[in-house]
């Protein structure tokens, strides 16, 4: 039978972050009504709150505080668990770590503190934050875990919020730093400072250790119960302190994200290779665009798109609703959910088959989520505000999301591997390391070995100066002063596919990496600079109130008042290098062209990938609209190909005239559409099994059987 999470893929969660200052709050919550709604929604694994960010509990706790709405009806939530368990559903218990407003105010010594010693409510936050380094708070968490495991019968536990919402300087953090490192905790962000880098590493280690502590508390009491930790900040800036250690503390991983369907596509691939066990879980709200809009609901097409993007990656879907403060729900939400889940259920027998197939591996470094050139600001600065991957506030995010975008639109099979699974590097036909400032020695050694043994590598920008020295014999020498630079092809080089020339070079709004020394191999492009160093911000005609910088000087020189066009003189600074190393091939770019969302840059990056692939065929391909994504799984003599139409609109228009193919050295016995198992006409030619889909709206799945 396997673990419950391998079989129960239709999940939901009802947010219950409700205070109790109003006597009506949560009084109308009825477990029978909600259970019926779950049945209507065709859910087979509900996640159920027993406590919330408020810190208030939904059971008669002895060590915490029960919500006043449950006084006199203390067993309501237990009754809901019992109803679901008796029906054959698998139940996941929700508990909030760190975000505990009730205990925050009860225990000032538990509070997270900023660099000035102020708690988080100083700035008006509703959320009270307790520090995981405080041993009294940990003891409280352990006691609560013991209580809820004794009181409720559940199949899994979901721990929310194991991350640093702020950089904490409480007494507990200061004491731990003093013990493990010594001296004052750093307060200024400086990626050139070894102590700051140590501090950054400690944030990750401390949070990973806290997550493992919570997991261990569950496992030593009920080892059969699964544990999952919120993993959303793995997509966010450095300050959240989440890396692969959170994944290792989880039986499987997942989270809720709100960056749109392209971010979800990337996250599904990243989590596929990050999770300890399949399937991963993808969560998102039914509210549009986020839970902040309490009474809005995404269109059926948007909800369906989210569910089927997850299913295309053989993941488990979880849709989030939010309870009304008095404890009621909108039953119409569950009717909509049910229609989608009844449709998705038909595909579930196929989701347990095979492994994801891809030729290109994008390397996502969970320790590289910083802007290494942005230094000298306080940890309490607004620069540390909610910076998320979809907002592209750090170089590695912009580059890797751009690479994913380009490969997806060119229907090139790609996956996302990570620094926690260096063993996956050797499986790549082509490895891409996009503008990663966080690579450590073990990863560099694994990449070197991979290339030496015949691997193909593309890396760019900030990535691994030591590899630049190893592969090309040149030394990294910082970045250009100019923050808008160009690359021009060298004589005889077609690296830019004719899209850009020496006179009209390729533009990137970034500082270019500089090197010293004579490079090994070929120089395919060189750096071209603008006529002058651009001002910190280009102030467009109507943008008088933009961020201030040094005032205008009449003698200021520029090439154009609206832009920073290239000068007529190119430099001899290498822009793109190519060399053989051992049995492998390496291409390096001084600028992360993969991160630029522009058709020419996308085409050029795809061309570089094709050049590195050489004669080896891709696992699949398509003649299809940019909005069509293909995902392939292989299980022995069967290949399962999913197509997703990524139009992120309220109402999706069908994709038309789509031709897709999978590579094979033999003709198939049959090609069938799923889940109806109807035969599909195909052609087998030139090592490809081709099918044609006249039109489809959002999702199709096909089985190629050999």
What do these predicted ranges mean?
Residues 1-56, 87-89:
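N-terminal structural segment of carbohydrate-active enzymes
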Residues 14-29, 59-75, 123-142, 192-209, ...:
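The substrate-binding groove and active-site-proximal loops of carbohydrate-active enzymes
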Residues 30-31, 36, 48, 392-471, ...:
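Helical hinge/lid and interdomain linker segments adjacent to catalytic or ligand-binding clefts
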Residues 39-75, 99-124, 152, 166-177, ...:
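Aromatic-lined carbohydrate-binding/catalytic grooves of carbohydrate-active enzymes
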Residues 49, 155-160, 189-193, 197-201, ...:
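Hydrophobic targeting/anchoring helices
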Residues 93, 97-152, 161, 177, ...:
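Active-site-adjacent "subsite" loops/lids of carbohydrate-active enzymes
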Residues 437-516, 609-610:
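A glycine-rich, often tryptophan-bearing local segment used as a flexible ligand/cofactor-contacting loop or short
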Residues 647-667:
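Surface-exposed beta-strand/loop patches in extracellular or lumenal glycoproteins
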């Amino acid at each position: 039978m396997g673990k419950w999470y391998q079989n129960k893929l239709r999940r939901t969660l009802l947010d219950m972050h409700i205070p109790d200052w109003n006597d009506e709050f949560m009084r109308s919550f009825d477990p029978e009504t909600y259970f019926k709604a779950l049945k209507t929604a065709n859910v087979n694994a509900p996640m159920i709150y027993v406590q919330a960010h408020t810190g208030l509990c939904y059971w008669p706790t002895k060590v915490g505080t029960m919500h006043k709405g449950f006084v006199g009806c203390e067993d309501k939530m237990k009754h809901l668990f019992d109803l679901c368990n008796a029906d054959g559903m698998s139940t996941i218990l929700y508990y909030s770590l760190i975000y505990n407003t009730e205990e925050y105010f009860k225990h000032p010594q538990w509070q997270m503190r900023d660099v000035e010693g102020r708690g988080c409510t100083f700035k008006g936050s509703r959320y009270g934050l307790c520090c995981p380094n405080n041993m009294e708070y940990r003891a409280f968490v352990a006691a609560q875990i013991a209580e809820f495991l004794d009181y409720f019968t559940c199949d899994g536990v979901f721990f929310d919020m194991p991350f640093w919402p702020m950089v904490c300087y409480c007494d507990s953090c200061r004491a731990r730093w003093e013990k493990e490192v010594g001296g004052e905790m750093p307060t200024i962000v400086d990626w050139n400072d070894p102590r700051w880098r140590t501090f950054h590493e400690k944030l990750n280690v401390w949070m990973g250790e806290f997550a493992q502590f919570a997991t261990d508390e569950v496992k030593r009491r009920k080892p059969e119960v699964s544990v999952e930790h919120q993993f959303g900040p793995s997509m966010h800036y450095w300050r959240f302190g989440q890396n692969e250690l959170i994944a290792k503390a989880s039986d499987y991983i997942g989270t809720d994200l709100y960056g749109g369907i392209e971010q979800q596509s990337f996250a599904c691939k990243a989590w596929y290779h990050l999770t300890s066990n399949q399937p991963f879980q993808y969560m998102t709200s039914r509210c549009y665009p986020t839970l902040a809009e309490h009474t809005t609901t995404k269109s059926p097409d948007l909800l369906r798109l989210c569910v089927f993007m997850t299913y295309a990656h053989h993941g488990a879907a979880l849709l989030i609703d939010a309870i009304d403060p008095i404890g009621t729900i909108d039953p119409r939400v569950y009717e909509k959910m049910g229609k989608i889940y009844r449709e998705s259920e038909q595909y579930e027998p196929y989701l347990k088959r095979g492994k994801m197939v891809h030729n290109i591996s994008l390397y996502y470094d969970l320790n590289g989520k910083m802007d290494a050139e942005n230094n000298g600001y306080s940890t309490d600065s607004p620069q540390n505000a909610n910076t998320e991957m979809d907002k592209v506030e750090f170089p590695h995010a912009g580059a890797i999301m751009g690479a994913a975008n380009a490969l997806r639109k060119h229907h090139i099979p790609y996956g996302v591997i990570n620094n926690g699974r260096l063993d996956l590097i050797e499986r790549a036909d082509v490895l891409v390391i996009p503008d990663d400032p966080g690579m450590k020695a073990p990863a560099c050694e694994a990449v070197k070995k991979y290339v030496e043994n015949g691997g193909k590598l593309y890396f760019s920008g900030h990535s691994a100066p030591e590899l630049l020295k190893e592969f090309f014999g040149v030394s990294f020498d910082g970045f250009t002063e100019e923050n808008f630079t160009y690359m021009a092809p060298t004589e005889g080089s077609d690296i830019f596919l004719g899209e850009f020339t020496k006179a009209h070079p390729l533009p990137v709004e970034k500082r270019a990496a500089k090197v010293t020394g004579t490079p090994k191999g070929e120089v395919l492009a060189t750096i071209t600079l603008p006529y002058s160093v651009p001002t910190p911000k280009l102030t467009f005609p109507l943008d008088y109130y933009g961020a201030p910088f040094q005032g205008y000087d009449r003698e200021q020189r520029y090439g154009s008042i609206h832009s920073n066009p290239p000068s007529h003189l190119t430099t001899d600074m290498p822009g793109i290098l190519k060399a053989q190393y051992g049995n492998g091939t390496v291409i390096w770019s001084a600028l992360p062209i993969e991160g630029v969302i522009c058709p020419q840059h996308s085409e050029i990056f795809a061309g570089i990938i094709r050049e590195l692939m050489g004669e080896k065929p891709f696992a699949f391909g398509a003649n299809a609209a940019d909005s069509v994504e293909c995902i392939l799984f292989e299980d022995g003599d069967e290949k399962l190909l999913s197509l997703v139409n990524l139009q992120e609109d309220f109402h999706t228009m069908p994709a038309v005239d789509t031709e897709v193919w999978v590579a094979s050295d033999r003709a198939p016995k049959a090609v069938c559409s799923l889940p109806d198992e109807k035969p599909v006409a195909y052609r087998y030619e030139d090592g490809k099994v081709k099918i044609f889909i006249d039109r489809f709206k959002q999702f199709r799945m096909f089985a190629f059987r050999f």
